[in-house]
Curated annotation (Swiss-Prot):
PROSITE patterns linked to this entry: CBM21 (PS51159)
Keyword Phosphoprotein part of the UniProt annotation: yes
Protein name: Protein phosphatase 1 regulatory subunit 3A
Post-translational modification: Phosphorylation at Ser-46 by ISPK stimulates the dephosphorylation of glycogen synthase and phosphorylase kinase.
Gene Ontology terms: cellular component: membrane; protein phosphatase type 1 complex
Organism of this sequence: Homo sapiens (Human)
Motif PP1-binding motif: positions: 62-65
Name of encoding gene: PPP1R3A
Subunit record text: Interacts with PPP1CC catalytic subunit of PP1, and associates with glycogen.
Disordered, as annotated region: 32-58, 332-351, 395-422, 496-516, 640-668, 963-983, 1025-1058
Described purpose of this protein according to its UniProt entry: Seems to act as a glycogen-targeting subunit for PP1. PP1 is essential for cell division, and participates in the regulation of glycogen metabolism, muscle contractility and protein synthesis. Plays an important role in glycogen synthesis but is not essential for insulin activation of glycogen synthase.
Length: 1122
C-alpha cells in the first residue's frame, strides 16, 4: 500500500474542512482493514472481489465518504490505487469459507418399501403411505410423494411435522399429483424446508401423514416411529476445494496475466494444424497455484514460452519438410499420371481431358491411354477400385507407386487382379510378349518399343479375368486363343496395328488386371460415362498413331463404352472407330459380356447355358477376346476394306469386320473356332445386338443366340412345319431373357405363339417378325431378333413350298440336323464352317438344333425355328413381302444364287484375309458350284436344291451369321472375295426378298464378316427383307441386313443375281432410305442418353422405332395391296 502521507497531502489541498477525527478515520481506514462500523468497508469489501477480476484494468477507483453518514457534513474524498485492493481478498476467502461451513443436508432415518408389492400391501393396511422422498441438493429441503388408497372421491392429505419432539407441530397440505390416479390409488406431493434457525447439526425433523376422507381419517407414521430426518453438516467440503484449486490455475493465469496462456492456445492450434499433439502436449506448462511473485511467474512463463516456441519451430520445420515432400511426390505422380494415363475412373481423375491432352503431347497415349491416374485424395480407395493404375497408386500412406504400362500383357492369364493391393500394384505388371520401353516416368516410350501383343481389349481381359475367376478352363482357353490371335494378329497386322493393339492391350491389361467383377462393373458404368472421353481419345490416338486401328484398340479397351458408342462410332466418321464398331458388335458383346460377366458372370452361365459346352463358354469369353483381337485385325483390314464402306454402313461393316476378324481368329485357332462357334451363335448375334444397342449386349446376344438357333431350327422346323403348313398354323417363337445377362442363356425362354391361319396360309414361308424390347437389356429385342430374323425367313412353308426343295430346311430331317449338331459339336470348326459356308440346310439345321440343344431343347427346335423366323415381330407387310420374296426365290435358282454367293464370297474373301478364304474354301469346298455341291453334300438332303440350302441358310443365316461370323470369317475371306460380285447380286436378291443388300461392297463387307455361303437366296431375301423390316423397327436392320447380305450372298447364284439385280437395287435403295431414319434416330438416341438420361433416351428411342415400324408397315401393306 501507499503510505498514508499521500492522502494526507492531498487532503490539505483537496479535502473539505473536516474535524480532526476525519483524518484519523481516514488513516484508520487505510491502515486497518476497513472497520466494520463504516458503510464504505462493506461496499469496498464486496467490490474488492469484483475489482480483482473486473476493475484491474482501470487505473483507479474513486471512493467518496460523506460527512452526513457520520452526522457531519461532507468530510473528505479519498483515492485508492487498484494495486491496494487485493488485500480485501482475505475477507472474500473468509466469506467463502463461512459459506461452505453453513451447508447442511437432511438425511432420512427410515426405510421405504423396497418393491411395489410391499408398498401396495402396506397401503391396503394403512390406506396412506410415504412412497418416496427426495432431498434437494444444496439446501435443507425435502420433497416427498404420498400414495393413498382411493377409498373416496373427496380426500385431503396433510403432513404433520415437528421440530421439537412434538412439543409443537405444523400441518402442511399435500397437493394432488396430476394424472397420478390409476383407479385404485392416488399420489400427493409435499415439500418441507428447514429454515436457518433450525439448520444446525443434529436437528431432527419428524412428520407423519394424515389422510382425511369421507369414510374417515387415516394415519401413517412409519409403524409408530414417525418419519424422521436429521440435519447434518455437509462433510464434503474438501471435495469442492480440489476442483477449486484446479480451476484457479486458469483463473490465476488470467489474474497474473500469464502471457503463455495465449501462446499455449496458439500452440494447441498449431498442434491441430500440424497433427503433432504428442510433442506439444508434453510442453504444455502447468502453473501451480503458489505465492510466487509476479516476476517469478512471468519468468517461468517466459521460459515455458521459449521452450514451446523452439519446439514448435522445430516441429513446424519437420512438418513443412514432410508436407513439402509429400506434395512433391503427389504432384510428380499426379503430373505423371496426368501426362501418361487417362483416368477411366471418374472418381479418380476428374480432368480426363487433361490426361488426354498430356497423352497427346507426350505421345504416350499408345500404351498409357487407359492407364488411370489417381488423384492424391482418392489414394487407396481409387487404387483399390482400379486394382492397378499403370502409374503409381496412392496407398493409404500416400506412397505412390506407378505401375508402368508394361502391365499391358499379351497373356490374360498373367494378368493379376490387384484390386486389394494398392501398394503392390507395381507387381501387377503384366508380362507382354515384347517388353515396352519405359521412359523416365515409367511410361512406355512411344517410339522406343511397342508391345506387339495383340492383347484383347480391356473387355477381353475382363472376360479373361472372369474366365479365370469363374472358368478355370475358360481362362486357359482365352490365353491360348489370345496367343493364336496374337500370332495371327502379328502376322496380319502392321507395326502400327501392333502399336494400336499395344495400346489396346495396355488398356485391356489395365482393365483386365484391375478388373475384377467389381471393377468391370465400375468400368462398365465409367465407360458409359466416359464414352465421349473414349471417343475423343480414340480420335486423338488415331490422329497421333495415324492408325484407325489404334482407335479401334482404344475402343476395344473401352468396349463397354463402345457398347454404348457402337452406334455412336458407326456414326463417327473415323474408320478405326467404325472398324471397332464393326468388330464391336461381338467384341462389344464380349466386352459387355466381360463387363456384365464380372457383374453377373453371365458369360460363363451364358456360354454354358447356350452351348452347354465350356469350350463354347470359354470361347464366348475367349471369343470375345478373340473378337477383340479380330477387331484389331479387322481394324487393319477394315482400315483398307471398310474405310469406304464404313461411312456408309458402319454397323454392317462392323458386323462384317467382326465376322472377318473372327474368321481369321478361328482360322488361326481351331479351339477358338470351336469356342467361337458357340460364341458366334450367341456372341455374333450379340454383337449385332450390341451394334444396335451397345449398352446391354449380352442379354440381347443371348437372345440372338437363341434366336439364331431358333432360326436354324426354324429351317428344321420348317421341315416339320411345312408338312403342317396346310393346317395353316405358324408358330412365332420369341426368345426372351427374363433377367440378368449372367443367366440369360439359361433363362432364355422360347415363347411359341400360334400364328393365325391367315398368317400361315401363304404358300411361302410366313415370316412374322416380332419387334420386342428387351426390358432387361433396355434395348429393342429387335436388335437380337433381327439377328435371328434371317433365320425366320420361311418358318412356315406350305407342303408345296416344302416340296420346292428350296425350303431345304423343311426337307432336312431332325436326325440329320442332330447329326450335324453332333458333327458341329465334335468338329465345331469344320461343321460350323460347313454349316456357315455351305453345309446347307442340314448345317444350319444342325446349328439350329445344336444351338437349341445347347440353349434349349431339341424338342423345341422346330418351334424355335418357327418362332425364330417370326421372331422379328415386324409382321407389318413382311409376310406379304415374304410371299413376294418366296415367289422371287422360286423364280430364281437357289443353286445359281448359291454359286454367285460363293463366288462373290470367295472373290471378296481374299481382300479380308487368306486364312478366312482358306477355311472358307475348305468349308465351301471351292468355287460357287463346289460350294453348292459341298452344301448339298453336307446337307444330307442332296435332293433338296441349293435353294433349300440357301433357304436353310437364310433361316440359319442369323445363326450361321452369328456362328459364321466366327467360323466363316476364316473361310469367308476367299468366299467373300468370290461373292463380292455374286454376293452383291445375291444380297440384292435377298434384299429384294427383304434385306436388300446395298452394293456388292456392302454385301461383301457383311459377307466377309458373317458370310453364309449356303443361303436360300429367295427365302433368305424374303427373310432378309422381313427381318430388315423388323430390324428397321428395332433399329438393327442395318446390321441384320449385313448378315442377311452375307447369307443371301452365300446362297444366291449368279443367274438369280442377274435376274434379280435390278429388283435388288431398287429394294436396296428403298432399304437404304428406310434405314436412314433409324440411323438418325439412333444418333439422336445416343445424344439424348448423353445429355439427359438413359431411360428418357431409351423411351424416346423405343417410341420412335415403334412409330417408324408402324409407318413402314403401313407403307408396305399399301404397296402389297397395289
Amino acid at each position: 500500500m501507499e503510505p498514508s502521507e499521500v492522502p494526507s497531502q492531498i487532503s490539505k489541498d483537496n479535502f473539505l474542512e473536516v474535524p480532526n477525527l476525519s483524518d484519523s478515520l481516514c488513516e484508520d481506514e487505510e491502515v486497518t482493514f476497513q472497520p466494520g462500523f463504516s458503510p464504505q468497508p462493506s461496499r469496498r469489501g464486496s467490490d474488492s472481489s469484483e475489482d480483482i477480476y473486473l476493475d484491474t484494468p482501470s487505473s483507479g477507483t474513486r471512493r467518496v465518504s460523506f460527512a452526513d453518514s457520520f452526522g457531519f457534513n461532507l468530510v473528505s474524498v479519498k483515492e485508492f490505487d487498484c494495486w491496494e485492493l487485493p488485500s480485501a481478498s482475505t475477507t472474500f476467502d473468509l466469506g467463502t469459507d463461512i459459506f461452505h461451513t453453513e451447508e447442511y443436508v437432511l438425511a432420512p432415518l427410515f426405510d421405504l418399501p423396497s418393491s411395489k408389492e410391499d408398498l401396495m400391501q402396506q397401503l391396503q393396511i394403512q390406506k396412506a403411505i410415504l412412497e418416496s422422498t427426495e432431498s434437494l441438493l444444496g439446501s435443507t429441503s425435502i420433497k416427498g410423494i404420498i400414495r393413498v388408497l382411493n377409498v373416496s372421491f373427496e380426500k385431503l392429505v396433510y403432513v404433520r411435522m415437528s421440530l421439537d419432539d412434538w412439543q409443537t407441530h405444523y400441518d402442511i397440505l399435500a397437493e394432488y399429483v396430476p394424472n397420478s390416479c390409476d383407479g385404485e390409488t392416488d399420489q400427493f406431493s409435499f415439500k418441507i424446508v428447514l429454515v436457518p434457525p433450525y439448520q444446525k447439526d443434529g436437528s431432527k425433523v419428524e412428520f407423519c401423514i394424515r389422510y382425511e376422507t369421507s369414510v374417515g381419517t387415516f394415519w401413517s407414521n412409519n409403524n409408530g416411529t414417525n418419519y424422521t430426518f436429521i440435519c447434518q453438516k455437509k462433510e464434503q467440503e474438501p471435495e469442492p476445494v480440489k476442483p477449486w484449486k484446479e480451476v484457479p490455475n486458469r483463473q490465476i493465469k488470467g489474474c497474473l496475466k500469464v502471457k503463455s496462456s495465449k501462446e499455449e492456445s496458439s500452440v494447441t492450434s498449431e498442434e491441430n494444424n500440424f497433427e503433432n499433439p504428442k510433442n506439444t502436449d508434453t510442453y504444455i506448462p502447468t502453473i501451480i497455484c503458489s505465492h510466487e511473485d509476479k516476476e517469478d511467474l512471468e519468468a517461468s512463463n517466459r521460459n515455458v514460452k521459449d521452450v514451446n516456441r523452439e519446439h514448435d519451430e522445430h516441429n513446424e520445420k519437420e512438418l513443412e519438410l514432410m508436407i513439402n515432400q509429400h506434395l512433391i511426390r503427389t504432384r510428380s505422380t499426379a503430373s505423371r499420371d496426368e501426362r501418361n494415363t487417362f483416368s477411366t475412373d471418374p472418381v479418380n481423375f476428374p480432368n480426363k481431358a487433361e490426361g488426354l491432352e498430356k497423352k497427346q503431347i507426350h505421345g504416350e497415349i499408345c500404351t498409357d491411354l487407359f492407364q488411370r491416374s489417381l488423384s492424391p485424395s482418392s489414394s487407396a480407395e481409387s487404387s483399390v477400385k482400379g486394382d492397378f493404375y499403370c502409374n503409381e497408386k496412392y496407398s493409404s500412406g500416400d506412397d505412390c507407386t506407378h505401375q508402368p504400362s508394361e502391365e499391358t500383357t499379351s497373356n490374360m492369364g498373367e494378368i493379376k487382379p490387384s484390386l486389394g493391393d494398392t501398394s503392390s500394384d507395381e507387381l501387377v505388371q503384366l508380362h507382354t510378349g515384347s517388353k515396352e520401353v519405359l521412359d523416365d516416368n515409367a511410361n512406355p516410350a512411344h517410339g522406343n518399343g511397342t508391345v506387339q501383343i495383340p492383347c484383347p481389349s480391356s473387355d477381353q481381359l475382363m472376360a479373361g479375368n472372369l474366365n479365370k475367376k469363374h472358368e478355370g478352363g475358360a481362362k486357359n482357353i482365352e490365353v491360348k486363343d489370345l496367343g493364336c490371335l496374337r500370332r495371327d494378329f502379328h502376322s496380319d497386322t502392321s507395326a502400327c496395328l501392333k502399336e494400336s493393339t499395344e495400346e489396346g492391350s495396355s488398356k485391356e491389361d489395365y482393365y483386365g488386371n484391375g478388373k475384377d467383377d467389381e471393377e468391370q462393373r465400375i468400368y462398365l458404368g465409367v465407360n458409359e460415362k466416359q464414352r465421349k472421353n473414349f471417343q475423343t481419345i480414340l480420335h486423338d490416338q488415331e490422329r497421333k498413331m495415324g492408325n484407325p486401328k489404334i482407335s479401334v484398340a482404344g475402343i476395344g479397351a473401352s468396349n463397354r463404352d463402345l457398347a454404348t458408342l457402337l452406334s455412336e462410332h458407326t456414326a463417327i466418321p473415323t474408320r478405326a472407330i467404325t472398324a471397332d464398331v464393326s468388330h464391336s458388335p461381338r467384341t462389344n458383346l464380349s466386352w459387355e459380356e466381360a463387363v456384365l460377366t464380372p457383374e453377373h458372370h453371365h458369360l460363363t452361365s451364358e456360354g454354358s447355358a447356350l452351348g452347354g459346352i465350356t469350350g463354347q463358354v470359354c470361347s464366348s469369353r475367349t471369343g470375345n477376346v478373340l473378337r477383340n483381337d479380330y477387331l484389331f485385325q479387322v481394324e487393319e483390314k477394315s482400315g483398307g476394306i471398310n474405310s469406304e464402306d464404313q461411312d456408309n454402313s458402319p454397323q454392317h461393316k462392323q458386323s462384317w469386320n467382326v465376322l472377318e476378324s473372327q474368321g481369321k481368329s478361328r482360322e488361326n485357332k481351331t479351339n477358338i473356332t470351336e469356342h467361337i462357334k458357340g460364341q458366334t451363335d450367341c456372341e455374333d448375334v450379340w454383337g449385332k445386338r450390341d451394334n444396335t444397342r451397345s449398352l446391354k449386349a449380352t442379354t440381347e446376344e443371348l437372345f440372338t443366340c437363341q434366336e439364331t438357333v431358333c432360326c436354324e431350327l426354324s429351317s428344321l422346323a420348317d421341315h416339320g412345319i411345312t408338312e403342317k403348313a396346310e393346317a395353316g398354323t405358324a408358330y412365332i417363337i420369341k426368345t426372351t431373357s427374363e433377367s440378368t445377362p449372367e443367366s440369360m442363356s439359361a433363362r432364355e425362354k422360347a415363347i411359341i405363339a400360334k400364328l393365325p391361319q391367315e398368317t400361315a396360309r401363304s404358300d411361302r414361308p410366313i415370316e412374322v417378325k416380332e419387334t420386342a424390347f428387351d426390358p432387361h437389356e433396355g434395348r429393342n429385342d429387335d436388335s437380337h431378333y433381327t439377328l435371328c430374323q434371317r433365320d425366320t425367313v420361311g418358318v412356315i412353308y406350305d407342303n408345296d413350298f416344302e416340296k420346292e426343295s428350296r425350303l431345304g430346311i423343311c426337307n432336312v430331317r431332325v436326325d440329320e440336323m442332330e447329326k450335324e449338331e453332333t458333327m458341329s459339336m465334335y468338329n465345331p470348326r469344320k461343321t460350323h464352317d460347313r454349316e456357315k459356308c455351305g453345309t446347307g440346310n442340314i448345317t444350319s439345321v444342325e446349328e439350329s438344333s445344336w444351338v437349341i440343344t445347347e440353349y434349349q431343347k431339341a424338342t423345341s427346335k422346330l418351334d424355335l425355328q418357327l418362332g425364330m423366323l417370326p421372331t422379328d415381330k415386324t409382321v407389318f407387310s413382311e409376310n406379304r413381302d415374304l410371299r413376294q420374296v418366296q415367289e422371287l426365290s422360286k423364280k430364281t435358282d437357289s443353286d445359281a444364287i448359291v454359286h454367285s454367293a460363293f463366288n462373290s464370297d470367295t472373290n471378296r474373301a481374299p481382300q479380308n484375309s487368306s486364312p478366312f478364304s482358306k477355311h472358307h474354301t475348305e468349308i465351301s469346298v471351292s468355287t460357287n458350284e463346289q460350294a453348292i455341291a459341298v452344301e448339298n453334300a453336307v446337307t444330307t438332303m442332296a435332293s433338296q436344291p441349293i435353294s433349300t440350302k440357301s433357304e436353310n441358310i437364310c433361316n440359319s443365316t442369323r445363326e450361321i451369321q452369328g456362328i459364321e461370323k466366327h467360323p466363316y470369317p476364316e473361310s469367308k475371306p476367299e468366299e467373300v472375295s468370290r461373292s463380292s460380285g455374286i454376293v452383291t447380286s445375291g444380297s440384292r436378291k435377298e434384299r429384294c426378298i427383304g434385306q436388300i443388300f446395298q452394293t456388292e461392297e456392302y454385301s461383301v463387307e457383311k459377307s466377309l464378316g458373317p458370310m453364309i455361303l449356303i443361303n436360300k437366296p429367295l427365302e433368305n431375301m424374303e427373310e432378309a427383307r422381313h427381318e430388315n423390316e423388323g430390324l428397321v423397327s428395332s433399329g438393327q436392320s442395318l446390321y441384320t441386313s449385313g448378315e442377311k447380305e452375307s447369307d443371301s450372298s452365300a446362297s444366291t447364284s449368279l443367274p438369280v443375281e442377274e435376274s434379280q439385280a435390278q429388283g435388288n437395287e431398287s429394294l436396296f435403295s428403298k432399304y437404304t432410305n428406310s434405314k436412314i431414319p433409324y440411323f438418325l434416330l439412333f444418333l439422336i438416341f445416343l445424344i439424348t442418353v448423353y445429355h439427359y438420361d438413359l431411360m428418357i433416351g431409351l423411351t424416346f428411342y423405343v417410341l420412335s422405332l415403334s412409330w417408324l415400324s408402324w409407318e413402314e408397315g403401313r407403307q408396305k401393306e399399301s404397296v402389297k395391296k397395289k
